[in-house]
Design a protein with these regions (language model features):
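Non-catalytic terminal accessory segments
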Residues: 1-126
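Generic serine detector
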Residues: 16, 28, 50, 55, ...
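N-terminal signal-anchor transmembrane helix
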Residues: 71-74, 97-150, 155-173
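Soluble catalytic domains of enzymes that build or remodel membrane lipids, polysaccharides, and related
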Residues: 136-367
Length: 367
C-alpha cells in the first residue's frame, strides 16, 4: 500500500467524524434532547476515535493484510452509512418545513432508510451488469466483439477473487479482445502477483490490452506495470506509439499521464497513416469531445473513471461534471464514446443509482 493513500484515507475517515456533528444535531432535534452539539464539544471524542482507528488501521497495514482488509471494509462502509444518514438528514430538514412529521416517521427517515440504502448499496456493488451495445460502421466489412472493463480497483477489498470472477465472464462471453482502461489497482494495498495470475486463464484466442489510469499514477505505476508485465496474456500499450490491429480494427492506447491525449492520438494516427481506418482509442478519462475524436480519425473511444458517481450525492455531481458520464454516446453515427461506470469501487464499497459494469461492444458492418 502506498503511503500517500494511507494519509489520504485517514484524513478522509477523520473528516467523516465532523459529519457526526450535523447528524447528531438533527437526531437530537428529533429525539427532543436539550444539548446542542458543536465541533468543540466533539473535539476530544473526534481525536479519541481517530487515534483508535488510525492505530488499528496502521497496525493491520503493517502486520496483517487480512485484518487490514476487514478494517478497511468496515471503515469505508461506515463512511458510506454516514454519508447516507447525512443526505437523509438534509432531506428531513427540507421536508419538515413542508410536511409535519411524527417522531416515528422522522426516525424512519433519518435512521432506518439510510441503513437499508447502505445494505442495498453494499450488495449492489457485487452484482455485475453487462451493458451490451451494437455499433454499425458502414466501411467495416466484418464484426468484432470488444469486452471493456475499467476501474477494477484491486487493493484492500478487491483481490484475486474479483479477477477470477472477471475472467469467468470473459471466457463465457468469448470476445475478440478485452480492453482494460485504467485503475486496475487503487493503492489501498499492494497488488500481489497471484491476484493477477487468473488473467492467464483467459482463452488463447482472446487478446487483452491495458492502459493506466489516475490511480496507477498516484499510487505506484512502476510497481503495477511490473506486475502486469509478468502476465503473458496482458499487453500493456499505454506508453508507446504501437498500433494493435485486431480483425481490421486499430487499437490505440494512451496512459492517463498524457493529459493532451487527443494530440498524442493524432500524432500516432498520422505517424501510422491510418486516418481513414477504423480506430479505437483507449483512454481513462472521457474528457475528449466526440467532435475532436471525429476530426482526429477516431471511430470509438473507450473510457472509465467516472464510476457513474458510485453513490449519492456523487452520482449527481459526476453527472453534472462530466459531459460523458456513463454508457454509449453517439455523434450522428459518425463516431462514439463508451464510458464504463467501473468494475470495482473507490473507497466506499457501495453503489447506489449506478452499476458495476462490464461493457460488451460489437462493431459490425452494415448488411
Amino acid at each position: 500500500m502506498n503511503f500517500k493513500f494511507v494519509v489520504f484515507a485517514l484524513i478522509l475517515l477523520t473528516f467523516s467524524f465532523f459529519l457526526h456533528v450535523y447528524i447528531i444535531n438533527i437526531l437530537s432535534e428529533i429525539y427532543q434532547t436539550k444539548e446542542k452539539i458543536t465541533p468543540k464539544t466533539l473535539y476530544y471524542e473526534i481525536i479519541k476515535y481517530s487515534i483508535i482507528y488510525i492505530s488499528l488501521f496502521t497496525f493491520s497495514w503493517l502486520f496483517s493484510s487480512s485484518l487490514y482488509s476487514v478494517i478497511y471494509f468496515i471503515g469505508f462502509s461506515y463512511l458510506g452509512l454516514i454519508i447516507n444518514i447525512s443526505m437523509l438528514c438534509a432531506f428531513y430538514q427540507i421536508i419538515i418545513k413542508l410536511i409535519p412529521l411524527s417522531t416515528f416517521s422522522s426516525k424512519i427517515l433519518t435512521i432506518v432508510i439510510p441503513i437499508l440504502i447502505t445494505i442495498y448499496s453494499l450488495i449492489k456493488a457485487q452484482i455485475v451488469y453487462l451493458q451490451e451495445e451494437s455499433i454499425v460502421c458502414n466501411k467495416y466489412k466484418g464484426s468484432i466483439k470488444i469486452l471493456h472493463v475499467s476501474d477494477m480497483h484491486l487493493g484492500a477489498i478487491y483481490q484475486k477473487n474479483s479477477v477470477e470472477k472477471l475472467v469467468k465472464i470473459i471466457n463465457e462471453q468469448y470476445p475478440d479482445v478485452v480492453v482494460i482502461t485504467g485503475d486496475i489497482s487503487d493503492g489501498s494495498a499492494k497488488v500481489e502477483s497471484d491476484w493477477m495470475e487468473p488473467f492467464n486463464k483467459i482463452s488463447d484466442n482472446i487478446e487483452v490490452l491495458y492502459i493506466t489510469g489516475n490511480h496507477e499514477n498516484l499510487y505506484g505505476k512502476k510497481e503495477i506495470i511490473n506486475e502486469i508485465n509478468k502476465i503473458k496474456k496482458i499487453k500493456y500499450i499505454g506508453n508507446s506509439d504501437e498500433i494493435i490491429q485486431i480483425k481490421g480494427i486499430n487499437f490505440i492506447g494512451i496512459d492517463y499521464e498524457y493529459r493532451n491525449a487527443i494530440k498524442r492520438a493524432k500524432n500516432i494516427i498520422n505517424k501510422n497513416s491510418i486516418q481513414n481506418d477504423i480506430n479505437v482509442l483507449l483512454y481513462h478519462i472521457p474528457n475528449i469531445s466526440l467532435q475532436d475524436l471525429n476530426e482526429a480519425g477516431i471511430f470509438l473511444m473507450l473510457a472509465g473513471h467516472t464510476h457513474g458517481g458510485q453513490i449519492f450525492p456523487f452520482t449527481v455531481l459526476a453527472w453534472l461534471g462530466n459531459k460523458y458520464f456513463t454508457g454509449l454516446y453517439n455523434n450522428d453515427n459518425k463516431n462514439y464514446i463508451f464510458v464504463s461506470s467501473g468494475y470495482g469501487t473507490a473507497l466506499c464499497p457501495m453503489r447506489f443509482f449506478t452499476k458495476k459494469m462490464i461493457g460488451i461492444i460489437e462493431i459490425k458492418g452494415r448488411n
